[in-house]
């Protein structure tokens, strides 16, 4: 069965969602060798993934994950693929606290850095959030304070079977795409940044197959895997089973475009300070702007704002009210008390 599937991909034939699910179920059950996994990943990357293949792989990974139950019918995630090489501060992580400050349930899925100096887990750890807590603590945080951090290694133990082939290949594969599609709380409203413009529709279509309610899949034309305030952004919006793709520009929300260097991040401690300054209301410039526009999209996805302009305005109000910073402090205290 594996040889037939591999031959199909080598001959540049797409797999069905079910075929992909079967292969990844075998990977995550330890039924394939490192050589087989490596050959499959390389052949798939050469052919190019489809949205059905992405969805099939994500379904297999979701089944193997440690799941948590969110009490809210609306659950937001702001996890992206990473890999944009932009070395910005942690925009999506900071925006997650703004969304939570609006009273929306946030299950922030993330990991340590892969391609930058500081991933979501790194900055949260620098802020004082305890990462190595049991999954039930994350579940309690999501349900009791409205935001929890789902540290990927604690929820996706089956990924251990892909560690060696991924490391030895050393190139980007489908595994670099699965994180935002495999939230352990089954987040159904997302702002999902991707590392290439051609991926926005593919991810939106995959999210649709996976049952998402509403999502904005975004790629800044400056290369950012976020909604950019330095350049226009390609958006594939999933709403009620339909995907629409369009561009938005910073001028739609703000008077001036920012400079790429305004988005620069640094070490985890430096990025933690940036996040605190934004959430406490001290930061009033481009860094705040990029956070409120990304948080604003999440507020629209969650049904809290009518459109992006209203979402941006609401995100700014939440920061100014102190509610976003309060959510950060609550998460820090909760993980320390329950770790």
Curated annotation (Swiss-Prot):
UniProt keyword list: Amino-acid biosynthesis, Aromatic amino acid biosynthesis, Glycosyltransferase, Magnesium, Metal-binding, Transferase, Tryptophan biosynthesis
Transmembrane segments: none
Gene Ontology molecular function: any one: anthranilate phosphoribosyltransferase activity
Known cofactor(s): Mg(2+)
EC number(s) given by UniProt: 2.4.2.18
Catalytic reaction(s) noted: N-(5-phospho-beta-D-ribosyl)anthranilate + diphosphate = 5-phospho-alpha-D-ribose 1-diphosphate + anthranilate
Similarity-based family: Belongs to the anthranilate phosphoribosyltransferase family.
Chain's role: Catalyzes the transfer of the phosphoribosyl group of 5-phosphorylribose-1-pyrophosphate (PRPP) to anthranilate to yield N-(5'-phosphoribosyl)-anthranilate (PRA).
Designated name of the protein: Anthranilate phosphoribosyltransferase
Organism in which the protein naturally occurs: Desulfosudis oleivorans (strain DSM 6200 / JCM 39069 / Hxd3) (Desulfococcus oleovorans)
Lineage of source species: Bacteria, Pseudomonadati, Thermodesulfobacteriota, Desulfobacteria, Desulfobacterales
């Amino acid at each position: 069965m594996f040889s037939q599937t591999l031959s199909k991909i080598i001959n540049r034939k797409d797999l069905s969602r079910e075929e992909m699910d079967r292969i990844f179920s075998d990977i995550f059950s330890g039924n394939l060798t490192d050589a087989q996994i490596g050959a499959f990943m390389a052949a798939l990357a050469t052919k190019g993934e489809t949205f059905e293949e992405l969805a099939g792989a994500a379904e297999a990974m979701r089944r193997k994950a440690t799941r948590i139950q969110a009490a809210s019918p609306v659950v937001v995630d702001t996890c992206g693929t990473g890999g944009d090489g932009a070395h910005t501060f942690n925009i999506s992580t900071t925006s997650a606290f703004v969304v939570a400050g609006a009273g929306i349930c946030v299950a922030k899925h993330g990991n340590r850095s892969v391609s930058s100096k500081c991933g979501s887990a790194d900055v949260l750890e620098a802020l004082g959030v305890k990462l190595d807590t049991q999954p039930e603590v994350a579940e309690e945080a999501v349900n009791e304070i409205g935001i929890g951090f789902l540290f990927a290694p604690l929820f996706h133990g089956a990924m251990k079977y892909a560690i060696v082939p991924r490391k030895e290949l050393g190139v980007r594969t489908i595994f670099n795409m699965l994180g935002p599609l495999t939230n352990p709380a089954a987040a159904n409203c997302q702002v999902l940044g991707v590392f290439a413009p051609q991926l926005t529709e593919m991810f939106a279509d995959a999210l649709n197959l996976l049952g998402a309610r509403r999502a904005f899949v975004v790629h800044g034309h400056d290369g950012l895997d976020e909604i950019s305030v330095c350049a226009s952004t390609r958006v594939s919006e999933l709403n009620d089973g339909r995907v629409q793709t369009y561009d938005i520009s910073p001028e739609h929300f703000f008077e001036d475009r920012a400079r790429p260097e305004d988005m620069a991040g640094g070490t985890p401690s430096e990025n933690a300070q940036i996040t605190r300054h934004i959430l406490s209301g001290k930061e009033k410039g481009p860094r705040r702007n990029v956070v409120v526009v990304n948080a604003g999209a999440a507020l629209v996805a969650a049904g809290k704002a009518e459109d992006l302009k209203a979402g941006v305005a609401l995100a700014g109000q939440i920061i100014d009210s102190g509610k976003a910073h309060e959510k950060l402090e609550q998460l820090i205290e909760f993980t320390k008390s329950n770790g």
